[in-house]
C-alpha cells in the first residue's frame, strides 16, 4: 500500500 513513502517489502 504505502509505496509512496518508502519501499517496504510486505512480508
UniProtKB/Swiss-Prot annotation:
| Alphabetically ordered keywords of this record | Amidation, Neuropeptide, Secreted
Q: Where in the cell is it found?
A: Secreted
Report the record's Gene Ontology biological process terms: neuropeptide signaling pathway
Which branch of life, at top level?
Eukaryota
Q: Which residues carry this modification: Valine amide?
A: 11
Gene Ontology cellular-component terms for this entry are:
extracellular region
Statement: the UniProt record of this protein carries the keyword Secreted: yes
**Primary localisation category:** secreted
Q: What does this protein do?
A: Mediates visceral muscle contractile activity (myotropic activity).
Q: Which family does it belong to?
A: Belongs to the periviscerokinin family.
What's the name of the protein? Answer: CAPA-Periviscerokinin-1
Organism the protein comes from: Striatophasma naukluftense
Q: What is the lineage of its organism?
A: Eukaryota, Metazoa, Ecdysozoa, Arthropoda, Hexapoda
